From Swiss-Prot:
GO terms for molecular function: tRNA (guanosine(9)-N1)-methyltransferase activity; tRNA binding. It holds the Pfam family tRNA_m1G_MT. One of its GO terms (biological process) is tRNA N1-guanine methylation. Monomer. This is tRNA (guanine(9)-N1)-methyltransferase. Its main location: cytoplasm. One of its GO terms (cellular component) is cytoplasm. The keyword DNA-binding does not apply. S-adenosyl-L-methionine-dependent guanine N(1)-methyltransferase that catalyzes the formation of N(1)-methylguanine at position 9 (m1G9) in cytoplasmic tRNA. InterPro entries: MT_TRM10-typ (IPR028564), MT_TRM10-typ_sf (IPR038459), tRNA_m1G_MeTrfase_euk (IPR007356), tRNA_MeTrfase_TRMD/TRM10 (IPR016009). Belongs to the class IV-like SAM-binding methyltransferase superfamily. TRM10 family. It comes from Cryptococcus neoformans var. neoformans serotype D (strain B-3501A). The active site is at residue 309.
Length: 429
C-alpha cells in the first residue's frame, strides 16, 4: 500500500495516539479530506463500507447519485479526484502569490545588487523576454510582419481519444508555450494551423483550451476539419478556390451559448491567404521517417503531431502520414538526442522551438542547444539525479513496508496537478 508521505506525517501529528495500521490511516486520510472542506455529506463508516454487500447510506440526489453501485475503491478514487478539483483553484492562487512574491524579491535584490549570479541571470533573462514580447506585440499592432517566415506549421490535434486527461492538460499547455515562442521569435512563423479542433472533434482539449484565450492568439488558425481536408485544399486538382468556413452540425448541436461565439473563430476549411494551393507542400515531421530534413523551405508546411503519449503509440504519426500520402521527414538532431540520458521524445513546443530557432540561426546544432542545452545533461548531473532518485525510492519503500497490511486496498499516491499557469505564456496578447 502506498501513501503520500507528507500527508501521512501530517495525520500522525494531528492524531498522535493512533497506531500505523492501514485501517486507521485509511480513515484519517478520508477524515483530512472531509474536515478541510467536505466533498459530500457522508460519514466515514458509510464511505468505507458502502458497496454491493452493504446497504448504502450515501445521500440520495446531487453528487451521491453518481456514486450508487460503485465499489469502495472507485468511490475513494472519485472522492479524491473531486477533492483535487476543489482545491485546484486554491493551489493556483497560492502559486500565483508565491510567484508574485518571488518576483518582488528578485527585483528588490537586483536593484540592491545582492542577488546570486544564477538569480541575476534569471532576472536579466526575464527582462529580455518581456522586452521581446512587447516588441513583437508592437510589430503585430503596427502591421509590421516583414520579418515573418512565409512557410507554415500545422499542429495535428487529431489524437484526442488516444490521450489521458493529464496528457490532454499537458497538450494544452504545450500549445500555449508554442504560441508564446512564436510571438516573441526573432523570425516568427506567419501561419500556424491547428487541425481537428472543436467540441465534437476534440472535446477534452476544447474544454481545456477554453481558459487559454486561444481565439485571441495572433498568427494562429483553428480548424475543426482534419489533416486530410487541408491536404485536399492544397491539392490544385481538388482544392476549392473560394470556400466558406464550415462548422459541422454535430459541433453546433453540442455547443452552448458561450461556445457558439468561439465556433465563429474556427476558420477551416479556408486556407490562410499566405498558403497557396499547388505551391505549398505538406511534410509530416516524424522521428520514424527515413528522410532527414536538411533545411526549411517557405514552399513547405511542416506538420507536428499534437500528441502526448510517453511513447506508447509507436509509428503513429509516420503511419498517419503514409495513409494520407504525405511526405515524412525527421529533424537532423539524432546525434543530439542520443546525448540525452533520460529524455528521447521531444514535446510539441520543443519541436516548434527548434524550427523557429533554426529559422533565426540557420544551424541545427545551435538551434537544438538553444532549446535543450546539453550542459544540463552532463554526466555529473545525471549521476546526481540518479542518486537523488534512489534515495527517494528507498524512502517510499520504507513507508510502504511500515503501513501495508494484507487485505487492505491501495489508497494510492496523491499526485500534484501537472498544470502550470505562467501568466506571460497564456496572456490575451
Amino acid at each position: 500500500m502506498r501513501f503520500h508521505l507528507g500527508l501521512t506525517e501530517a495525520l500522525q501529528e494531528r492524531e498522535p495516539n493512533i497506531n500505523a495500521s492501514s485501517k486507521d490511516l485509511s480513515l484519517l486520510h478520508f477524515e483530512l479530506y472531509r474536515r478541510s472542506e467536505p466533498i459530500m455529506d457522508i460519514d466515514e463508516e458509510s464511505y468505507l463500507n458502502a458497496g454491493p454487500s452493504a446497504p448504502s447510506k450515501i445521500p440520495q440526489g446531487g453528487e451521491g447519485d453518481g456514486l450508487q453501485g460503485m465499489s469502495k475503491k472507485a468511490m475513494k478514487r472519485a472522492a479524491k479526484q473531486a477533492r483535487l478539483e476543489e482545491i485546484k483553484p486554491l493551489k493556483r492562487a497560492a502559486e500565483r502569490e508565491r510567484r508574485r512574491q518571488r518576483t518582488a524579491q528578485l527585483a528588490e535584490g537586483y536593484a540592491a545588487g545582492t542577488l546570486s549570479e544564477a538569480d541575476k541571470e534569471l532576472v536579466e533573462r526575464r527582462r529580455r523576454v518581456e522586452k521581446e514580447r512587447k516588441e513583437a506585440q508592437r510589430r503585430i499592432e503596427s502591421g509590421d510582419q516583414a520579418n515573418d517566415w512565409l512557410g507554415g506549421v500545422v499542429i495535428d490535434l487529431g489524437f484526442d481519444d488516444l490521450m489521458t486527461d493529464q496528457e490532454i492538460a499537458s497538450m494544452a499547455q504545450q500549445l500555449g508555450y508554442l504560441y508564446s515562442s512564436n510571438r516573441t521569435a526573432e523570425k516568427p512563423v506567419r501561419t500556424v494551423i491547428h487541425t481537428t479542433f472543436s467540441p465534437a472533434a476534440s472535446p477534452r482539449l476544447w474544454q481545456r483550451m477554453e481558459n487559454f484565450n486561444w481565439h485571441k492568439w495572433s498568427r494562429c488558425h483553428w480548424w475543426e476539419q482534419g489533416l486530410e481536408t487541408l491536404k485536399s485544399q492544397l491539392d490544385p486538382s481538388t482544392s476549392i478556390l473560394s470556400v466558406q468556413s464550415v462548422v459541422s452540425k454535430e459541433t453546433q448541436d453540442k455547443a452552448g451559448i458561450d461556445t457558439k461565439s468561439l465556433l465563429s473563430r474556427l476558420t477551416g476549411p479556408q486556407v490562410p491567404v499566405d498558403l497557396q494551393a499547388g505551391k505549398h507542400k505538406l511534410v509530416y515531421l516524424s522521428a520514424d521517417a527515413e528522410d532527414e530534413l536538411l533545411s526549411l523551405s517557405e514552399d513547405e508546411i511542416y506538420i507536428i503531431g499534437g500528441i502526448v503519449d510517453r511513447n506508447r503509440h509507436k509509428n503513429l504519426c509516420q503511419g498517419k502520414a503514409e495513409q494520407l500520402g504525405i511526405r515524412t521527414a525527421r529533424l537532423p538532431i539524432g546525434t543530439f538526442l542520443e546525448m540525452l540520458p533520460t529524455r528521447k521524445a521531444l514535446t510539441v513546443n520543443q519541436v516548434f522551438d527548434i524550427l523557429v530557432k533554426y529559422l533565426h540561426l540557420g544551424d541545427w546544432a545551435a538551434a537544438f542547444e538553444a532549446v535543450i542545452p546539453i550542459r544540463k545533461y552532463a554526466p555529473g548531473r545525471k549521476a546526481k539525479r540518479a542518486k537523488t532518485e534512489t534515495k527517494r525510492n528507498e524512502k517510499v519503500e520504507e513507508e510502504v513496508e511500515c503501513t501495508s497490511a494484507e487485505g487492505e486496498e491501495d489508497i494510492g499516491v496523491i499526485e500534484e496537478s501537472a498544470e502550470v499557469d505562467p501568466e506571460d505564456v497564456f496572456s490575451n496578447q
